[in-house]
Amino acid sequence: MMKTHNLFVSCIESRVQDQGSLYARFHIGTFFRGQALTFGNSIRRALLSEMPGFLMTDVRIQGATHEFAVLPDVEETVLEILLNLKKTVFVPRIPKNQKFETFQGFGFLKNNGPGKVRAADIRLPETVQCVSPEVHIATLTSGAELSLRFNLQFRNFSQLEKREGTFKSKTVAQAKTEDGNVQDTTNELPTLEKNSLFFQQLQNKRNSKDQLFLDTVPMPVQKVNYVIKSLNAKNGSEYIILEIWTDGSLYPQESVEFALRNLTDLFFQFANISKKSN
């Protein structure tokens, strides 16, 4: 429990659920009337969209040129295989005191039928571990062969959304005129940075016909709920009951710390800009 005067962030309950997913319930406060709603909406969005994690960016399956292809002697379609691959969960295999900032590598799988293919059959780099080995990938009949390779990346919000942005416009910095008014630059189209994630994906799609593209943003937090409760009816103070479900690659306590840090950094930057402009 972290407590500063009348502020608190307490983990009330935590448990492991089915298929390795993690659940935790927190009490966060104290807020004045109306502040809890603002805080709850902000931290929920940060938890769902700004968490670091592994993701498969694209997959190559031998014999498949598109998502709707059917492989011989394989019960699942290519689309079903891709959806099953997305259920696999990866974590870095490093000491706890060591930071894991970036990673880009690949994994592969090659199995012959008959039999079932699971996530445990995937071959990975030494620094990556699959924590969902029981996830079903495909069912092979006699004579079937499943061979695939995928690109694996570790990404976080700071890498995906750098402050300079994916689109860069030279006119934005000059939008403020000498008299302090802001010019309307909506008719000027920004230029696309060649090193941006979106630009790289467009280039990859043009250069490869057998690449099957998957996610571009990691989502280790699967679900977030919050309820606002009254703490003291006399002074109108409130607190939040926050529930978090993750896929097992990230502890709910860690996700709360990440979200609070990201929100603090974001608002702090705008506070500095406001000071400089005055």
Swiss-Prot record:
The answer to whether UniProt assigns keyword Cell inner membrane to this entry is no
An example of a GO molecular function for this protein is: protein dimerization activity
Catalyses: RNA(n) + a ribonucleoside 5'-triphosphate = RNA(n+1) + diphosphate
Question: Has the keyword Mitochondrion been applied to this entry?
Answer: no
Keyword set, alphabetical order: Chloroplast, DNA-directed RNA polymerase, Nucleotidyltransferase, Plastid, Transcription, Transferase
Question: Its Enzyme Commission number?
Answer: 2.7.7.6
Q: Where does it localize?
A: Plastid, Chloroplast
Q: Which GO terms describe its cellular component?
A: chloroplast; DNA-directed RNA polymerase complex; mitochondrion
Its predominant location is plastid
Which terms does the UniProt entry file under GO BP?
A: DNA-templated transcription
Q: Give the top-level enzyme category.
A: transferase
Q: Tell me, how does this one assemble? A: In plastids the minimal PEP RNA polymerase catalytic core is composed of four subunits: alpha, beta, beta', and beta''. When a (nuclear-encoded) sigma factor is associated with the core the holoenzyme is formed, which can initiate transcription.
Question: What is the role of the protein in this entry?
Answer: DNA-dependent RNA polymerase catalyzes the transcription of DNA into RNA using the four ribonucleoside triphosphates as substrates.
Similarity comment text for this entry: Belongs to the RNA polymerase alpha chain family.
UniProt protein name? DNA-directed RNA polymerase subunit alpha
